Amino acid sequence: NEDRNDIAYVLGRLFSVLESIQKEANPTITTTIHDRYFNSACATPAVIFPVLLKLKNSHMKKLERDKGGAKVYYEKEVGKIMGKFDDFPKRLSLEQQGQFALGYYHQQQEKYKKGEDK
């Protein structure tokens, strides 16, 4: 739901897009950021999201080299989502972690509807 602005939900959506970028840049990858960072990202976003955004930059360089259109698309998606908040919260409550997961899975469903993921 792109109209929801609560931070935990929006961060879940952002995490999903970052994972999609990773998968698009590295189609044969077996361990994704979801496997490695999901639990930490939904509990302590201020610590984990800077790491994820650095990884995104590496993946975007690869996309720019191999799939320029995908890079532009994902930059717009990340920009739209990040425009909904000013800071990464240090911690999310258990209820907020549930909203993070909901945002993640809603964004995943949107991706499948659009046929972006294999």
PLM regions and their residue ranges:
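Intrinsic-disorder/low-complexity detector
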Residues: 1-118
